[in-house]
Curated annotation (Swiss-Prot):
Acts as a metalloprotease. Penetrates intact tissue and specifically cleaves the vesicle-associated membrane protein 2 (VAMP2) (part of the SNARE complex) involved in pancreatic secretion, thus disrupting the normal vesicular traffic. This is Venom metalloproteinase antarease-like TtrivMP_A. Zn(2+) binds at H319, H323, H329. The active site is at E320. Disulfide bonds join C295-C386. Binds 1 zinc ion per subunit. Belongs to the venom metalloproteinase (M12B) family. Its EC number is 3.4.24.-. It comes from Tityus trivittatus (Argentinean scorpion). Glycans are attached at N151.
Length: 394
């Protein structure tokens, strides 16, 4: 048994909220012989042109969730990594588009009246802007007993692909925001298509795969959620307590997707933060994850909050994922990573504005060179065995 102490480190980030600026548009869509879709429209002072490629590989071969037509969903997923677009394009009937256009714009069918022009349904463009500061936390594990790397069953081979597999669980507060499992799955799929776009900025060829989603309700929520809920108001969690409980829960319940996956993420619509003496909670934390926890059954957990309707936490999920892949915050040294010999990120100041820093233009949707080096280092270690797969297997 490995015993450890977890140190919690915080970094200020910003969240995004709808600005109130919206516009109704009729996008044009053209499909080339190669299958690339070009979407064009003008809205909110932006001339948008996207070159979208199929991204159905985001869903694993055996993606699992109840009451969802997975193959139909797979055909609808498109992305433009250059512009950060992650969209569901439905051509069964009048064409509809929903999802992330770029860092500032979201698109969805305009349901009020179902206006149709030249066979195209009207769409609503919503602008999101950076808002109040929140915090990210990472649990750095100081192990008292070193792991034996010789016990790793499979090492990476030259022709392997790097594929990070995710199992997503949602708490009842997040689940009840959606009318159906299908609507929830659409939202989560767009979210992780956006994560793939951000992972591409590492230039390490890392693929993102969703193995499945379990949408908990009030009756089915596991003990690590129920037992650690602070009643508030509002209902909330203490992040370091929750990540410890979640990690222990899945350490003791290594079955099915929880066993097979590389990372397990809880998405919650409840807040996270520090309890006050009066019983309320200072909501200040967007996400938390275990440092370098990938492939470790008892440490491969991460948590992200999302109480929006417009997929504004894609960057949080990418940020927490990279903590799990061995990167600290920019500006932090190797002592903030649970990987012996890690180069750390002290040479990349947080003020440079990358995803693992304080997120400012022009770098706020990219990872720093230090983050890349840290992830590369973890990928070189035997303990990262689980994310290497034969390319024909996915």
């Amino acid at each position: 048994m490995i015993s450890y102490l977890a140190s919690i480190f915080l970094l200020a980030t910003v969240s995004a909220v709808p600005s109130g600026r919206v516009e109704v548009v009729f996008p044009s869509v053209e499909t080339s012989r190669s299958g690339v879709k070009t979407v064009k429209f003008t809205a909110l002072d932006q001339n948008v042109e996207l070159k979208l490629r199929s991204a159905g590989e985001i869903l694993g071969k055996h993606f699992a969730i109840q009451d969802v037509d997975v193959e139909s969903l797979r055909r609808k997923i498109y992305r433009d990594s250059v512009n950060g677009a992650a969209l569901l394009i439905d051509e069964d009937g009048p064409l509809t588009i929903e999802g992330i256009v770029n860092s500032k714009l979201r698109i969805q069918p305009f349901e009020s009246g179902r206006i149709i022009k030249d066979g195209m349904i009207a769409h609503q463009i919503v602008e999101v802007i950076d808002d109040k500061k929140s915090y990210d936390r990472v649990a750095v594990i100081h192990e008292n007993v070193k792991r034996n790397a010789e016990n790793v069953s499979r090492m990476a081979e030259e022709n392997d692909c790097i594929v990070v597999e995710y199992y997503i669980v949602t708490d009842s507060a997040f689940t009840k925001r959606f009318k159906s499992n299908s609507a929830l799955t659409n939202y989560v799929t767009v979210m992780f298509t956006g994560v793939q776009n951000l992972m591409d900025t590492l230039e390490l060829g890392i693929g993102v795969r969703l193995l499945g989603v379990t949408a908990f309700n009030e009756e089915t929520e596991p003990s690590f959620i129920k037992d650690n809920l602070i009643p508030g108001p509002p209902e909330a969690f203490e992040p370091d307590v929750l990540i410890t409980a979640m990690s222990q829960y899945y350490c003791n319940h290594q079955t099915g997707l929880a066993k097979d996956t590389d990372l397990i993420f809880l998405i919650t619509a409840r807040g996270m933060g520090d309890p006050r003496e009066d019983g309320t909670v200072d909501i200040n934390t967007a996400g938390i994850a275990n440092s370098a926890g990938v492939c470790k059954p008892c440490l491969k957990a991460g948590i992200a909050t999302d109480d929006s309707n417009y997929n504004e936490r894609v960057d949080t999920l990418a940020h927490e994922s990279v903590h799990l892949l061995g990167s600290p915050h920019d500006g932090e040294g190797p002592d903030q990573v649970s990987v012996e010999g890690s180069p750390g990120a002290a040479n990349c100041p947080a003020k440079a504005g990358y995803i693992m820093g304080n997120r400012k233009d022009p770098n706020k949707y990219k990872f720093s060179p230090c983050t890349k080096k840290c992830v590369e280092y973890l990928l070189s270690k035997p303990t990262a065995f689980c994310i290497f797969e034969q390319c024909s297997d996915f």
